[in-house]
From Swiss-Prot:
Protein known as: Outer kinetochore KNL1 complex subunit KRE28
Cell compartments where the protein resides: Nucleus; Chromosome, Centromere, Kinetochore
Keywords in alphabetical order: Centromere, Chromosome, Coiled coil, Kinetochore, Nucleus
Function: Acts as a component of the outer kinetochore KNL1 complex that facilitates microtubule-kinetochore interactions and the spindle assembly checkpoint. Kinetochores, consisting of a centromere-associated inner segment and a microtubule-contacting outer segment, play a crucial role in chromosome segregation by mediating the physical connection between centromeric DNA and spindle microtubules.
Quaternary context: Component of the KNL1/SPC105 complex composed of SPC105 and KRE28. Part of the ten-subunit outer kinetochore KMN network that includes the KNL1, MIS12 and NDC80 complexes.
GO cellular component, as recorded: kinetochore; Knl1/Spc105 complex; nucleus
Taxon lineage: Eukaryota, Fungi, Dikarya, Ascomycota, Saccharomycotina
Keyword Membrane: no
Originating species: Candida glabrata (strain ATCC 2001 / BCRC 20586 / JCM 3761 / NBRC 0622 / NRRL Y-65 / CBS 138)
Coiled coil: 59-81, 111-132, 210-239
UniProt record similarity statement: Belongs to the KRE28 family.
């Protein structure tokens, strides 16, 4: 199982490196195309000159600022162009075909006003069409760039979540190995106490059976998560669409887990902010009101009807970043709740006592 995790981790690393390399290649290719376009524009224009470092025309850090400056410059050039175009049209209307000079009209001349209105109308029509075409092309470019960026972010997020799930698998594997070590220690202790009564032998056998049952559940959960990770990794490598579906499945699984926690917390007390279970040590730890910590230790043996009872209780509070035991209150609630089998009701009473202790 450990070898499978190593193999899966290496595969995820290789795939992630490949995606990052491809993204970097696309970025470098885009920068080269922009660089070539700028150089070609400089070569074909008498008004543009290259200054500074000729080997690095593009500074990525200044790209957004320079892009806005270029937009302003292009707007000024368009206005200059249309002024020249307007002058050209005006001269065409005011100069005869035989190139003879005609009297210059005054600003108040009706014919001058008519020609000026016609030139302005033609200019506005052409500018409107061209600006619409430019806006449409610009919008399409921005839309495609936005879609590419979203897909890249989704792929990167998928690999990050896959890595987090893999870390959880390692934690489960460590827990499983610790349980195996504890089982071996338990077996050694059992071998040294073979002279106990038949009842003790049956109890030890039952405890071993419970431990093996927990190990089997842990092993099944670990194997299921490994299988799910392999499926997610295969989907991420095959296509971006399947990767998005894996992200949705992961989010849905986390939502189900959160919903289960919320229902458990709501059934006990509304001030509970965290619940942690330790199955092997038979402990239950609660975080209440972001200040109090309650630890419940259950009896090793169950009652005749198969129920667990409270064996010990620890209470702590936080004051000025220090954890302080609540000894007096612990004695009281332990005396009241020790041996109780209604765990949920006991937890409600303990939480109320802890919260009301400072009031």
């Amino acid at each position: 199982m450990e070898a499978q995790l190593h193999e899966l981790q290496e595969e995820i690393t290789r795939s992630s490196d490949l995606v990052l390399t491809e993204q970097d290649k696309r970025l470098q290719g885009t920068l080269r195309e922009i660089d070539q376009s700028i150089r070609k524009l400089i070569e074909t224009s008498d008004y543009l000159k290259l200054s500074g470092d000729a080997d690095s025309l593009i500074d990525i850090k200044q790209l957004e600022v320079k892009s806005r400056e270029l937009d302003s410059l292009m707007d000024l050039l368009r206005k200059l162009y249309w002024r020249e175009e307007s002058l050209d049209l005006f001269l065409k209307y005011t100069i005869n075909s035989d190139a003879e000079q005609v009297p210059v009209f005054s600003d108040t001349d009706p014919k001058y006003q008519s020609l000026q209105d016609e030139v302005s109308h033609l200019r506005d029509d052409v500018m409107t069409v061209k600006n619409q075409e430019i806006d449409q092309i610009t919008g399409e470019i921005l839309q495609v760039a936005h879609e590419i960026t979203e897909k890249q972010d989704q792929v990167n997020m998928l690999y990050l979540e896959t890595t987090n799930e893999l870390d959880k698998c390692w934690e489960l594997l460590d827990e499983w190995q610790r349980l195996q070590d504890d089982q071996r220690i338990t077996k050694n202790e059992d071998n040294s106490n073979r002279k106990d009564t038949e009842l003790n032998a049956m109890e030890e056998c039952y405890e071993e059976w419970k431990t093996l049952e927990e190990l089997a559940v842990l092993n099944d959960n670990l194997q299921k998560q490994i299988d799910e990770l392999e499926k997610v990794d295969n989907k991420a490598i095959n296509s971006t669409q399947l990767a998005e579906e894996s992200i949705v499945n992961t989010v849905q699984l986390n939502d189900l887990i959160d919903m289960w926690k919320r229902r458990i917390i709501a059934s006990i007390h509304e001030d509970i902010s965290e619940i942690v279970l330790y199955p092997y040590s038979r402990k239950l730890q609660l975080r209440v009101a972001n200040r109090y910590t309650i630890i419940i230790q259950l009896d090793k043996h169950q009652t005749h009807d198969g129920k667990s009872t409270i064996h010990d209780i620890d209470l702590f509070t936080e004051q000025d970043s220090r954890i302080i035991p609540m000894r007096e209150l612990r004695k009281q609630v332990l005396q009241e709740c020790k041996g109780h089998s209604n765990i949920l009701q006991a937890l409600k009473n303990i939480i109320n006592r802890v919260i009301n202790n400072d009031n």
